């Protein structure tokens, strides 16, 4: 029996190693590590008693087909597991088999073009990816001296984002918004516009969203011709909280392999990172931990950091991530939103007011920010135009009350010009999306930064406007005839 102990020790050690060859042997050797018995079942939480070879935290164990992850060690021999598949048919005393390793997922070229679940298993109806290497989904973030900061921009072709909240190549960008303000449409548009022009690979990770959206995305990726250099991972809202909590880590493990072992640039899109926090809170509740601020788990900050700190650029390659963030009840002071915000280099805030006025994408020009918006990175002209656009829109915001009470006529000529410019800018910053063609009926447009700057500059310089505001609504670049009069 001591031989078994040594073996399990060896397997656990190699499962945590980053050497691919060592890891390869894990799958083979992990067949006979420890046997336990189901002691207690409470919802998705299962207590298992092991007499020997007690599994460690994060180890994967199986009761028949039911996969569980060890979340806590209760006392000598008893471990508390979180079920990753429905607990249907599970009974007390049933045998539990420990694999001696955490979840291992296939990595490398073999996963490209595939739609997979948290275990790296196919959900696209095709055979399992033919990968030679698999890795544990629990990895440490790169050490500080390995990390690098880029100061280049990822052009998205979306006017409001490129102008006011430029996305950092190799950085993290959040798309914040309450329910139904257009986060999913925007992230799909970003895939459309950036994945095609992106030289490396793209990963899309769906966490806790609707399965219908996953299906639509799969189809759209095929139409855009980017599917063969994209991996899609899903832990949707119908799945167990443990799955929604871990699927982001599966995505990152694959992204890290492309970055570190293949030296590629990775575009990582996550919809929706709030659902990761929410799943963590559900797991925490199942484990019986006391809730903390606003009912969230006490481990909110560390859990989020364990995911976000891995999304980083190193000397070997960059991971550029764009994450949709659901903001509960439109409350931006919500602890989950506030914590996510602190990890990002750019945040695009979507406003309900703009969405209700039909100003899509509903980017709030005053609340959206980016550390890239400095003269040193974007250039003096871009910086000055962005500042002037913000100032004009802020002045218009201040004038709105007066206009509502006294009417536009009561404003001074200078203020009237500000209002005319601001209303045209607001409309010019809307844009028809390729991903919204089916419900908006408008043909999508991609606009270069140069065209966006030229358009805004022209509006800012105009003093008399002979045209209609509506001419600026849902267009791409400003056409030539719209010159100053
Ligand atoms: N760019 C756009 N152009 C036209 N309509 C849009 C656009 N973006 C969003 N919409 C409208 O808003 C609706 C909701 O968008 P979306 O599903 O992206 O919101 P969401 O913020 O992801 O919502 P949820 O939080 O429910 O997932 C769309 O179905 C569409 O009617």
UniProtKB/Swiss-Prot annotation:
Q: Where in the cell is it found?
A: Cell inner membrane
Q: Which UniProt keywords apply?
A: ATP synthesis, ATP-binding, Cell inner membrane, Cell membrane, CF(1), Hydrogen ion transport, Ion transport, Membrane, Nucleotide-binding, Translocase, Transport
Q: Where does it mainly reside?
A: membrane
Q: Which InterPro entries match?
A: AAA+_ATPase, ATP-synt_VA_C, ATP_synth_F1_bsu, ATPase_a/bsu_AS, ATPase_alpha/beta_chains, ATPase_F1/V1/A1_a/bsu_N, ATPase_F1/V1/A1_a/bsu_N_sf, ATPase_F1/V1/A1_a/bsu_nucl-bd
Query: What EC designation does it have?
Result: 7.1.2.2
Substrates-to-products reaction catalysed: ATP + H2O + 4 H(+)(in) = ADP + phosphate + 5 H(+)(out)
- SMART domains referenced in this protein's UniProt entry, alphabetically: AAA
What this protein is called in its record is ATP synthase subunit beta 2
The beginning of the lineage is: Bacteria, Pseudomonadati, Pseudomonadota, Betaproteobacteria, Nitrosomonadales
